[in-house]
């Protein structure tokens, strides 16, 4: 057998090889660190924007090469045309939820937008992709600004309170809620809240217009501020059923917040409704004074409630029932009733990016970028509504080649 002439590696040569590998790996590690330091750190996208990551392409939204029309001016706002790709989260919304609210607006179609109601009804059984494509093809998006070109406004929320009442007054249920009394006329001042409790003539005019009696004066005020409510009524014969007290009219007096009175006249600083009720329970001798600081009173009309009304709110100013989470109150001098609106509001309490319908208004809802978000009925909706006061952006969706 021939001998093997190759020498076995010495210990020193092994050490040299190991040192070479160590130096090489150290060099590569240093290079890697330097390269990493020169790069921007990875920033995860917002969860609202990562889903379907950029399936929201310009092609999908019909923006490619599409010229923008001229701005549109309203009495309290201006609408600036923008590409669909500029609407935050437009490809993420569950449009079928908004479609129910849109169908309600089609019950009382307004000019121009109402002309598209046949398509709205046809698409009610389509998926969100088909609905989105139709919106993009038939509408132009406009960013809403005030007349000074400010596009950021304020979002609040409202809801339908639920409370118990009796048809007849008692020691416990003694606070009346009224229908429209004689002499109340649109645009004309009527008696203040204080006068309704102290003026003989005002009290005479109110007689016979009591609808129900509630147990708590602050609950009555909340119901008036929200504009409507669901009431569990006990009748004189003991039967119990639900009714809706819907907005009918006001005394046309200016609205003043009771929180302003508390701020100016007490040390109390818990301005949520539970906080205000807590103050009232501890200061019964001053409750009337607090309530009288707001001279505005709302009058109601009674409406029956059925099982089908569980998912429907009260009728808004457009004349159709409101949809929780999909109806907003607006200034009609900024945005017409029945208009589809893309709403974006991001605060510490909630983030909203969704299609809503302009279906209501309110005395405090004035200005270009101003909306009141209908949260639904009951205590959970009330708790949500009480937390919402945050920045707002709005985009009007208006039919192509049409002027309001």
Briefly describe each language-model feature range.
Residues 1-17:
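N-terminal secretory signal peptides that target proteins for export/translocation
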Residues 23-33:
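Bacterial N-terminal signal peptides
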Residues 35-63:
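Bacterial Sec signal peptide processing site at the extreme N-terminus
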Residues 38, 310-404:
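C-terminal soluble interaction/assembly domains
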Residues 52-86:
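N-terminal low-complexity, Pro/Thr/Ser-rich intrinsically disordered segments
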Residues 77, 150-152, 224, 238, ...:
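A generic structural signal for short, non-catalytic loop/turn and secondary-structure boundary residues
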Residues 78-305, 309, 345:
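Secretory/export targeting leaders with adjacent low-complexity proregions
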């Amino acid at each position: 057998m021939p001998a093997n002439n190759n020498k076995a590696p010495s210990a020193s040569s092994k050490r040299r090889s190991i040192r070479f590998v160590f130096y090489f790996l150290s060099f590569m590690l240093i290079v890697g660190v330097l390269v990493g330091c020169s790069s921007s750190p990875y920033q995860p996208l917002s969860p609202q924007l990562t889903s379907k990551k950029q399936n929201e392409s310009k092609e999908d939204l019909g923006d490619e090469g599409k010229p923008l029309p001229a701005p549109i001016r309203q009495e309290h706002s201006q609408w600036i045309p923008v590409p669909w790709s500029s609407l935050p989260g437009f490809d993420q919304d569950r449009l079928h939820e908004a479609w129910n609210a849109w169908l309600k607006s089609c019950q009382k179609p307004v000019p121009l937008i109402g002309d598209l109601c046949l398509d709205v009804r046809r698409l009610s059984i389509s998926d969100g992709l088909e609905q989105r494509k139709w919106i993009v093809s038939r509408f132009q998006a406009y960013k809403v600004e005030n007349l000074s070109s400010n596009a950021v406004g304020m979002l609040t929320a409202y809801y339908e309170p639920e409370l118990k009442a009796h048809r007849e007054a008692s020691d416990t249920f003694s606070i009346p809620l009224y229908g429209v009394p004689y002499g109340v006329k649109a645009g004309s001042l009527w008696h203040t809240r204080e006068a309704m409790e102290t003026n003989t003539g005002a009290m005479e005019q109110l007689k016979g217009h009591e609808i129900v009696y509630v147990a708590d004066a602050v609950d009555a005020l909340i119901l008036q501020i929200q504009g409507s409510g669901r009431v569990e009524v006990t009748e004189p014969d003991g039967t119990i059923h639900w009714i809706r007290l819907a907005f009918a009219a006001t005394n046309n007096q200016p609205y003043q917040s009771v929180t302003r009175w508390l701020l100016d006249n007490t040390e109390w600083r818990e301005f949520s409704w539970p906080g205000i009720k807590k103050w009232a329970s501890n200061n019964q001798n001053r409750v009337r004074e607090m309530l009288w600081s707001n001279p505005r009173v709302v009058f109601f009309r009674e409406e029956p409630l059925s099982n089908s009304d569980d998912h429907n709110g009260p009728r808004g100013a457009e004349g159709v029932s409101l949809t929780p989470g999909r109806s907003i109150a607006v200034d009609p001098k900024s945005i017409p009733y029945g208009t589809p609106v893309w709403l974006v509001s991001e605060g510490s309490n909630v983030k909203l990016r969704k299609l809503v319908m302009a279906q209501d208004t309110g005395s405090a809802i004035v200005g270009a970028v101003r909306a009141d978000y209908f949260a639904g009925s009951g205590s959970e909706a009330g708790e949500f509504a009480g937390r919402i006061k945050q920045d707002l952006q709005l985009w009007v969706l208006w039919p192509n080649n049409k002027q309001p």
